[in-house]
Amino acid sequence: MTTLTAQQIACVYAWLAQLFSRELDDEQLTQIASAQMAEWFSLLKSEPPLAAAVNELENCIATLTVRDDARLELAADFCGLFLMTDKQAALPYASAYKQDEQEIKRLLVEAGMETSGNFNEPADHLAIYLELLSHLHFSLGEGTVPARRIDSLRQKTLTALWQWLPEFAARCHQYDSFGFYAALSQLLLVLVECDHQNK
């Protein structure tokens, strides 16, 4: 990626982690449809590989603003996709895709991080990977830890995530009838792919 700074990429990962970790509340719903968010999306679209995914997400948000009981409908989508059985869902856990759930714990230890007691989900939840990537990108921008060390850990995290993210995104597309979380997962997929190629 060329136009986005390490801090901007960190912010995108942190934002996506938040959206995949819990249902949207009224404040978040208002925020994603705000002018400030539209500016942020414009910035993301300046990165050509992200443009189509951001456009799709913006279309979903526009549709969302005219949807009756949008928050309740999105909460139902979130619950159906991420909290139910894996039969018709896109469970946001590495272990649901036959990946080593201990890998993220090792990566967190290597980064000097641990999961928060406030987050009542297993450590292999998608949001934990995204928080770690956000932390690593912020660290790259600060320059306090050798960049080579951070970059090595970033690549390991991206590789571990890429083992199951495409299947997760495909399941979001298959089972999210409204499409908001499908669009989010597509943006994440493209972001991770670009980040992974940016060695």
Swiss-Prot record:
This is Chaperone protein TorD. The keyword Cytoplasm applies. Belongs to the TorD/DmsD family. TorD subfamily. InterPro entries: Chaperone_TorD, DMSO/NO3_reduct_chaperone, HscB_C_sf, TorD-like_sf, TorD/DmsD_chaperones. Involved in the biogenesis of TorA. Acts on TorA before the insertion of the molybdenum cofactor and, as a result, probably favors a conformation of the apoenzyme that is competent for acquiring the cofactor. It comes from the Bacteria. Gene3D superfamilies: 1.20.120.1820, HscB, C-terminal domain. Keywords: Chaperone, Cytoplasm. Its main location: cytoplasm. Pfam families: Nitrate_red_del. It is found in: Cytoplasm. GO terms for biological process: protein complex oligomerization; protein folding. The keyword Cytoplasm applies. One of its GO terms (cellular component) is cytoplasm.
